[in-house]
A protein has these predicted regions:
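Intrinsically disordered, low-complexity regulatory regions enriched in serine/threonine/proline
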Residues: 2-20, 24, 36, 43-156
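Pyridoxal 5′-phosphate
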Residues: 29
Length: 156
């Protein structure tokens, strides 16, 4: 009516932000043997022990879809099986919820879980995730890369 142009609001799109974060993290851990499966980065060590990094977004229905957590897990097949005679062949990959040992970024180093606000600068989030992965998660994954090491550390 008056010729004023209405500025279009920039919509926040959490999946696109998580895609960017996940791509950067994957580029850093791919040389270490991780493969991408949806929102999960997975690798096998010692043949069949899974090590998992998973990106979890909040739920829109709860109003926290702008938040993200990084889940960390290790799956030891013998601890996941429900019978003494395993019949299922090894899967191509496992998810964080399949893991025997589970935690979140932040808790790995004995602090509170790290929650990321996806409305903040993406490059800052990526730097923090990579920093925590390199300083705390990957060293733990290196230590807990065999059944013997997992049992030894669990006894401590």
């Amino acid at each position: 009516m008056f010729g004023f142009k209405k500025e279009k609001a920039t919509a926040f799109h959490a999946p696109a932000v998580i895609d960017a974060i996940e791509s950067a993290v994957y580029a850093a851990v791919k040389p270490l043997g991780f493969q991408k499966h949806g929102r999960t980065l997975h690798r096998f060590v010692s043949g069949d022990i899974s090590q998992v990094i998973n990106f979890q977004c909040g739920q829109a229905i709860r109003g926290d879809n702008h938040l993200m957590w990084v889940n960390i897990g290790i799956r030891v097949p013998e601890c996941d099986l429900r019978s003494f005679q395993p019949e299922d062949p090894l899967k191509k990959h496992y998810h964080e919820y399949d893991c025997t040992i589970r935690t979140r970024l932040g808790a790995v180093r004995g602090k509170a879980e790290t929650t990321y606000d996806l409305r903040k600068p993406t490059d800052k989030i990526i730097r923090d995730i990579l920093s925590q992965l390199q300083a705390y998660v990957l060293p733990v994954f290196d230590i807990l890369s065999s059944r013997e090491a997992i049992l030894e550390k669990r006894r401590e």
